Design a protein with these regions (language model features):
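Short, low-complexity, intrinsically disordered N-terminal peptides in bacterial proteins
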Residues: 1-2, 187
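Flexible gly/pro-rich beta->alpha loop and the following alpha-helix that scaffold active-site loops
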Residues: 2-3, 10-75, 87
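Generic recognition of short, well-ordered alpha-helical segments
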Residues: 15-18, 57-58, 78, 137, ...
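Short glycine-rich anion-binding loops that position phosphate/pyrophosphate groups of nucleotides
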Residues: 48-52, 79-81, 167
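A general structural detector for well-ordered alpha-helical segments in enzyme core domains, enriched
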Residues: 59-63, 94, 177
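Pocket-forming structural segment of enzyme catalytic cores
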Residues: 65, 74, 81-159, 164-173
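Acyltransferase
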Residues: 166-187
Length: 187
C-alpha cells in the first residue's frame, strides 16, 4: 500500500517512515512546502512538526479535499492538530506542555482491544505545547480517547490521529499504534 507522508521539517519524520515501512507501506516523503497536489491513492500522512497548525494554512485546501474524498488519513502530533483545525476546533496551549516525556495513557477495554494489547496502561512519548481540548459535544462518527482534558487519539472511518509520537522509542508497544492503519483503514 502506498503512503504519502507530508514532512513538516521534523526530526522524527524518518522514524515515522521506518515504522510505516515496517507496517507494510511504500512511503514517499514530500515537504509541506512542495505539497501542491494530492496523491492518486493510498494513505495520506501528516507528520509531526513545529508551530501552530495555522502556520500551514496554505495546504489546508488540499487536506480538506482529501478528507472530503474519504481517502485514508493518518495524523501524528501536528497532523492531529491540523485535522482538528479543519473540523473547526480550537488548538490551544496545553495545560501540561510536554517535550520528550512519557505520558501514561489509561486504556479502556475497548481501546486496549483495538490496539491488540491486554493492558490498561501504556506509555506514549509526547512533544507538544499545544492540544485539542476535549469536546462537550463530540462527533458520534468518531471515537476519541481523551485524557487530562485533551484529545489524545481520534479514530473514525478511514481516519486515525495521535497527539503523541507512536514512532518514538519512548512509546511502549509502538507498533501496536501502527497496526490499525492496515486493519481499520480502507485503500
Amino acid at each position: 500500500v502506498k503512503a504519502t507522508l507530508i514532512d513538516f521539517d521534523d526530526s522524527f519524520t524518518y522514524n515515522l517512515v521506518q515504522d510505516l515501512e515496517e507496517t507494510g507501506f511504500s512511503v514517499t516523503v514530500l515537504s509541506w512546502t512542495d505539497f501542491e497536489e494530492l496523491p492518486s491513492s493510498g494513505l495520506l500522512v501528516l507528520g509531526p512538526g513545529p508551530g501552530h497548525p495555522d502556520d500551514y494554512l496554505r495546504i489546508y485546501p488540499l487536506i480538506e479535499k482529501w478528507l472530503s474524498s474519504k481517502g485514508p488519513f493518518f495524523g501524528v502530533c501536528l497532523g492531529h492538530q491540523i485535522y482538528w483545525r479543519l473540523q473547526g476546533e480550537l488548538v490551544v496551549r496545553s495545560k501540561n506542555p510536554t517535550h520528550g516525556q512519557k505520558m501514561t495513557l489509561q486504556l479502556s477495554r475497548e481501546w486496549s482491544n483495538w490496539l491488540g494489547l491486554d493492558l490498561k496502561l501504556v506509555d506514549v512519548q509526547r512533544y507538544n505545547s499545544l492540544c485539542v481540548p476535549a469536546m462537550t459535544h463530540p462527533n458520534p462518527e468518531l471515537k476519541n480517547l481523551e485524557q487530562d482534558g485533551e484529545i489524545i487519539i481520534t479514530r473514525g472511518k478511514n481516519l486515525l490521529t495521535y497527539q503523541f509520537h507512536p514512532e518514538s522509542v519512548g512509546t511502549s508497544y509502538h507498533m501496536a499504534f501502527f497496526r490499525p492503519l492496515l486493519k481499520d483503514l480502507v485503500y
